[in-house]
Amino acid sequence: MTITTPDPSRLTATQALALIRSNELAVETYARSLLSRIESRDETVKAWAYLNPEFILAQARKLDAVPVEERGPLHGLPVGVKDVIYTKDMPTEHNSPLYKDSHVPVDAAPVAILRAAGALIFGKTTTTEFASTTNGPRTYNPHDPTRTPGGSSSGSGAAVADYQIPMALGTQTGGSTIRPGSFNGIYAMKPTWGAVSREGLKVYSLVLDTLGVFARGVEDLELILGVLGVKDDEVSDGEWGAFQGVQGAKFGLVKTSVWPQAGPGTIAAMDKAAAILRSHGAIVEEIELPPEFDSMPAWHATIMAVDARTSFLSEYRRDKTKISKHLTGYVENNEGYTSAQHLAALDGIASLRPQIDGIAGRFAALLTPSVPDEAPVGIQGTGSAAFCSMWTALHTPVVNLPGFQGDNGLPIGVSLVAPRFRDQHLLAVAKEVGKLFEEEGGWKSSL
């Protein structure tokens, strides 16, 4: 059979997978639908750093020819890959002239895992330079092309939101997955640090870098993260306990020390999110983190700066005129960071990780802002990661949930956070809470 749906590009990954498995949708048909969408929208959004339609269709035909009994759990599902993640059959350029047309003949570990599961590696999505600056690539927010899609995983967030791809990989060192998720009105997850291999990803900070995933539904996040090996320990009812639904569940509302940076859109979104949860029988308790957490932004900034000095020294030595002044400043240590400051930041954050696990473990999840407000106007910058960086440094899993909007009608998300290595629990909570926020939050995509 062949699918009669006019536009398969509108399908979520799990919807498409069901149709491919039932032989109602050919992989080639699906790929052609996505390519048609990209062709019609690329001039507006510009989400792709590399795309080869002929190669995509050839790979799709090969996947269609695979016998049913030999097909993997992601058979035929297209995935976009941020252009700081190695792909053996596509260039990896890092949005840097130093790496123009650079080919590495291996897949990054996450790409290899997805490919082995039958995924169709579709192309490379745009990124800021080395996923390390706030200067945006020439990628535009699909909901309002006068605004940034966020970064540094700019193309992944924009492409998923614009129905150009059902799922995409990103990375996060500060807020590079959660921020584009919020600005583009889609689901995005930064799993627990270390839960997914980072082999084959451009290194910025070994203690912060984390693979991220974008999708248009929590079921899709569960699907891809399950294949990537993200799982929780078995727990007893008396320990964490399984999530039994929103009714009666406890949520901790955490504004954090950077709350003064919240704009009217995020303030309203947090208020509405709490109200929706309470209206469905949840208990929402606003909590203040211990004062030592106030040091998190400065500690995160210290680690970013010092680790960048190490990570980008090779590019600096090759030709410092071909990297941004932002990065040369890190390598030259313009801020004057010392090893003592670096150690204090590393040790300080490490001491807080067990604390946040204990705090978050008292609740179904913590509810916290994703971003200060709607996506800013212009593509010269990608917006602030102020509300994301703490959770990145603490290594906790975080999910952005869409559903809210700002003063200009653009999407704003909120985040749910759980203790480390409670990723599947967090996804179970996000699935139920996300439905409520989508239904009652007030924002719907018009794309």
Give the residues covered by each predicted segment.
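An N-terminal boundary/leader segment
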Residues: 1-57, 279-281, 341, 442-447
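Short helix-loop capping/hinge segments that flank enzyme active sites or metal/cofactor-binding pockets
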Residues: 4, 74-94, 245-250, 302-357, ...
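Glycine-rich, small-residue loops and helix-cap segments
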Residues: 23, 76, 82, 116, ...
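Acyltransferase
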Residues: 27-32, 61-64, 264-288, 313-318, ...
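Acidic/His- and Gly-rich active-site-bordering loop/insert found
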Residues: 56-58, 66-136
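Glycine/threonine-rich flexible loop motifs
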Residues: 92-101, 263-264, 375-382
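Short glycine/serine-rich loop segments
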Residues: 106-225, 394-413
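A short helix-breaking turn/cap at a secondary-structure junction
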Residues: 190-268, 272-273, 436-447
